[in-house]
């Protein structure tokens, strides 16, 4: 990484970045060498050089996370003190890519150390980590990439990976107008929002309002810290268990038809069905463990780039969380196609309300929350939801191409308790594969869910 021509820059993070700032986004990419030959597959020098050029184009990943004012955060890029990425390579001479394919990429046969389960980001750690696992006889490569969530959202993650791949494919061409342009400056998003939905200018600490806000903020932060300690961390790797499920196309069609029979005027999406199915399964499990029947709340992300005109190549967090409440009455009956369909209709009704006013209201609330509690806001949000979702099904993970074609398999990993990630399915367009969901729960909850078979009628477990 010597010789990087980087200028000093400061990126002020938005409230939407600060909420998940304690986490990494992590994915494993499986690349098969389909044309074996004398040349090394996905050469180390090519990967490193193209990464160098991609970071030159996206310097936010070379910065350090810093506290700013009372509860704000920044990523500070200092050309004399760059936060260089972690880049490691391992060779596995006994593990052939064919073995992974024969076992349908079950994680039990992954390279050693490839399966990362801890989602937490170190406050002083690298914003980018890359672990390359080279398989026997140049048969393939497994690339595990982690990017700090404060720097990008899932779409920003994919955009950076595609940028890296572009520089790898065009390594011999000069940089010109065709190279990927990524927008990391958060002011890009604020340009599409009214002034009252933007961070206020800082006041003097001696201003009465600032002094009072500071006192209240300190008390709330102390309370949330104590609350978190009493409840336990939501993310420790030894207290979470994850599995990858697949919801077949015929199941989605059946549940969609059931919803149409209940309300012919509504058209539920695959996302609505997944939200309903996994939230109900989780709620039924918690009901058995706690013997309490109550309304359950799922938080469903809604990317608003296209809704208010934010450029698609903006890489910061750009989604609001919509709250879908499912009444306890749906837990009084077994988990059936009808109960899932009714819950999916509730999800669709909420998603349909996501207009510009809803987006602005959410961001105002996030601004107020950050002003009071800073990055402890994730504790606050955790108390408000039963199940959280991340919809990544439309993102171009399978278009990340370093010159040898896209990956055969992309696997999400290392998510927090109660998070369900809706993944893109492998294959051209994912047609006929259905929807894959990576679910993370506490072990006792996951064991109960699997033992009772709440998902058996609707899903297949991949691993």
From Swiss-Prot:
Alphabetized InterPro entries for the sequence: CAT-like_dom_sf, Plant_Fungal_Acyltransferase
Highest taxon of the lineage: Eukaryota
E.C. number(s) listed in UniProt: 2.3.1.-
Keywords noted in UniProt: Acyltransferase, Transferase
GO molecular function: acyltransferase activity, transferring groups other than amino-acyl groups
Catalytic residue list: 149 (proton acceptor), 401 (proton acceptor)
Pfam families: Transferase
Protein's GO biological process: helvolic acid biosynthetic process; secondary metabolic process; secondary metabolite biosynthetic process
Group of enzyme by EC: transferase
Pathway stated in the Swiss-Prot or TrEMBL entry: Mycotoxin biosynthesis
Upregulation: Expression is under the control of the secondary metabolism regulator laeA.
Family indicated by similarity: Belongs to the plant acyltransferase family.
Role: Acyltransferase; part of the gene cluster that mediates the biosynthesis of helvolic acid, an antibacterial nortriterpenoid. Protostadienol synthase helA cyclizes (3S)-oxidosqualene to (17Z)-protosta-17(20),24-dien-3-beta-ol (protostadienol). The synthesis of protostadienol is followed by several steps of monooxygenation, dehydrogenation, and acyl transfer to yield the final helvolic acid.
The protein's name in its UniProt record: Acyltransferase helD2
Species name: Aspergillus fumigatus (strain ATCC MYA-4609 / CBS 101355 / FGSC A1100 / Af293) (Neosartorya fumigata)
